Structures are given as structure tokens and as C-alpha cells.
Design a protein with these regions (language model features):
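N-terminal leader/targeting segments and the immediate start of mature chains
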Residues: 25-67, 78-81, 219-224
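An acidic-aromatic
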Residues: 72-120, 190-191
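Beta-turn initiation residues at beta-strand->coil junctions
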Residues: 58-60, 86, 102-103, 181-184
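Flexible, surface-exposed loop/linker segments and immediately adjacent secondary-structure boundaries
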Residues: 113-149
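Bacterial N-terminal signal peptides
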Residues: 14-27
Length: 224
């Protein structure tokens, strides 16, 4: 897989991990308007969703750039599993193994994410990372790109690292994220803006596994 593909796909997968982190890892709070309670209600909304499907646009911009790059994609999630579709790649993750297919190269890379990668794909590790490594702050209310009222929550790391801050915009009444922005120390700002989200999309577990029968001529590169 070419390096630029890896970077773009990895950014998407990282956002998926962050999404799963905040929706799976956090406990349900009371109904006061503070950061942890807002995140708690978002967790409850996801746990009760019975699977979700979402369309999104991802924007990436480097410091000093007047214009960045963007692309659209879709994602389906159930528990810690997801299937991600972007213009350049398809990714399946069944909670343990990840398959990334790049059509231009006609190849599939198979990995079992470990270490730093698991911090983005394993909800339990993400939960521990959030609880131990970030401080959540309620920043007020705003209007989401879809016109709905939303809460703004900002996460800042307790220790210096690659991430400077994570900004979450969570719809006030549905409790689902409308926008997630991650700012890195290298000046890159990446935003996923969710345009459509449906609940009750309870796909079977096999939906989150790469099926070689659907891609008979593809080259499978097992990196496990």
C-alpha cells in the first residue's frame, strides 16, 4: 500500500477508534451539563443503538495551509467492530483482525493491531487512555453543521504527546457526535463531520470480516 494511502486510511481508523473510545468506554453519568455526563450519555446512546451506519466527510489541514484535503466515506459499527469505506480503501475490523483493501493496488493487508494501533481500535485500552491521559472540559453549546443544537467538549492530554487536543461536538438530543476534530503537535488538524447517522443497523459478525470469495484475484499480504 502506498504511503499516502496508509496515512489517509490510518487517520480514518484513528478517528474510528476515538469514536469507539468515547461511545464504548465511558460510563453513564447523571444529567448535569458537564463533560463527563455528556460523554456518558453518548456512551449510553451507542450501547442502545443496536449497531449504527454513518456517512461522513473528513477534512485535513496543516498549519499555514489555506486549503487542505477532504474526502467522503461511510462506516458501519457494532460494538468494537467496524467496516470503513473511503474512496481509496475498504477496511474491516472484527475486534481482533484488521483487513485493509486498496483497489488500485488490488491487495489486502492483514494485521492484528498491537501497541499504539490498539489504542485506537480496542475500546478497553482507549477507555484507560482517556481516563488516565486526558482531561475533559465542557466548552458550551453550539449549532452542528446539520443545524441541530450541540454540546462542545474538549479533551486535552495530561502529558505531552502527538495529540494536542480533541474537540467533540455532540448533538444535544440524540447524544451522538456530529463532529470530531483532532489537533496534532505537527500542526495537522483533522476533522470528521458526520452528515447522516442511522441506528438499529445490526449487521451479522461476518459483515466485519474480509471475504476472500468476493475478491478472488486480490493479493493477500498477511502482516500478522
Amino acid at each position: 500500500m502506498r504511503r499516502e494511502y496508509k496515512v489517509r486510511v490510518w487517520r480514518c481508523i484513528a478517528f474510528v477508534g476515538l469514536f469507539l473510545c468515547f461511545l464504548l468506554g465511558l460510563g453513564v453519568g447523571a444529567y448535569a451539563q458537564n463533560a463527563n455526563d455528556i460523554l456518558g450519555k453518548a456512551a449510553a446512546a451507542y450501547e442502545n443503538s443496536n449497531g449504527i451506519s454513518a456517512s461522513f466527510t473528513m477534512f485535513t489541514r496543516s498549519a499555514g495551509q489555506n486549503a487542505g484535503e477532504s474526502f467522503e466515506g461511510t462506516i458501519q459499527m457494532k460494538g468494537d467492530k467496524f467496516t470503513l469505506v473511503t474512496p481509496e480503501a475498504l477496511t474491516w475490523f472484527n475486534g481482533t483482525t484488521q483487513w485493509t483493501y486498496v483497489e488500485r493496488n488490488d491487495e489486502v493487508n492483514v494485521t492484528n493491531p498491537t501497541g499504539e494501533e490498539l489504542q485506537f481500535t480496542n475500546p478497553a485500552l482507549l477507555f484507560n487512555s482517556y481516563k488516565k491521559g486526558f482531561t475533559a472540559a465542557y466548552k458550551g453549546e453550539s449549532t452542528a453543521p446539520n443545524g441541530k443544537a450541540a454540546y462542545d467538549v474538549e479533551l486535552t492530554p495530561k502529558k505531552k504527546g502527538d495529540i494536542v487536543k480533541v474537540e467533540l461536538q455532540i448533538e444535544k438530543y440524540s447524544n451522538f457526535p456530529a463532529r470530531i476534530t483532532v489537533t496534532s503537535k505537527n500542526g495537522v488538524s483533522s476533522t470528521i463531520q458526520i452528515s447522516q447517522l442511522k441506528t438499529g443497523i445490526n449487521q451479522p459478525d461476518r459483515f466485519f470480516v474480509f471475504n476472500e470469495g468476493d475478491y478472488p484475484d486480490v493479493e493477500v499480504i498477511d502482516l500478522r
